[in-house]
């Protein structure tokens, strides 16, 4: 829409439909895919970026699979290596907790999962589904200090505007599930 410097591109699962219907996604080969928990493959992707001189802007991971492989989880070792590599290369780490947040482990964030409590937070983490009680359109993004410093107010248009009723619902959900 002319607001972003570069449009985000989806992973392999959405590539076909986007290529067919959106000209800006055609002939793009900018997504790199690594199998969850394959640390050697993850390291190889970042090494390839170094060797070929390209920058990985963002690594996205879903800590507990929803649709693709329900219940499959990333390991702490994989998460830690992803965090290390993204920091070392200046990339952002995004954790997609849209489906799993609250439901997958009974807590909101990946850094609250059992065995992950002392893990370093991601740069961005997203939530929706359980947080909005299945009632109102609401997605939430949590930003680390580094990611917040990169955020430019006004660039993201209506995508990032508020919905007061949905926010009230999320607050009520959080109050109900917070010990």
List where the protein language model places each region.
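PLP-dependent aspartate aminotransferase-fold enzymes
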Residues: 1-57, 77
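A glycine- and small-aliphatic-rich helix-loop capping segment at beta-alpha/alpha-beta transitions
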Residues: 8-16, 76-81, 108-122, 143-149
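Conserved beta-strand positions
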Residues: 33-34, 61, 127
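Local beta-strand N-terminus motif with an aromatic residue
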Residues: 54-56, 90, 122
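Conserved PLP phosphate-binding loop immediately N-terminal to the Schiff-base lysine helix
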Residues: 58, 62-75, 90-116, 130
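Helix C-cap/helix->beta junction micro-motif
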Residues: 85-89
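Active-site PLP attachment segment
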Residues: 115-150, 162-167
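Structural motif of enzymes handling amino- and sulfur-group chemistry
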Residues: 162-179
């Amino acid at each position: 829409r002319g607001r972003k410097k570069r449009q985000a591109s989806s992973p392999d699962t959405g590539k076909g439909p986007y290529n067919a219907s959106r000209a800006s996604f055609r002939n793009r080969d900018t997504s790199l895919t690594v199998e969850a928990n394959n640390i050697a493959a993850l390291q190889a992707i970042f090494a390839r970026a170094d060797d070929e001189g390209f920058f990985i802007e963002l690594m996205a991971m879903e800590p507990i699979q929803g649709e693709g492989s329900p219940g499959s989880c990333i390991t702490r070792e994989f998460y830690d290596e992803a965090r290390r590599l993204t920091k070392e290369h200046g990339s952002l780490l995004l954790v997609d907790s849209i489906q799993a947040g609250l439901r997958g482990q009974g807590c909101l964030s990946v850094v609250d999962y059992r065995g992950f409590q002392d893990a370093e937070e991601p740069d961005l983490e997203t939530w929706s589904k359980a947080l909005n009680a299945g009632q109102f359109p609401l997605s939430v993004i949590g930003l680390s200090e580094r990611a917040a410093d990169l955020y430019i107010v006004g660039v993201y248009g209506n995508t990032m505007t508020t919905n007061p009723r949905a926010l009230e619902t999320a607050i009520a959900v959080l109050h109900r599930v917070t010990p």
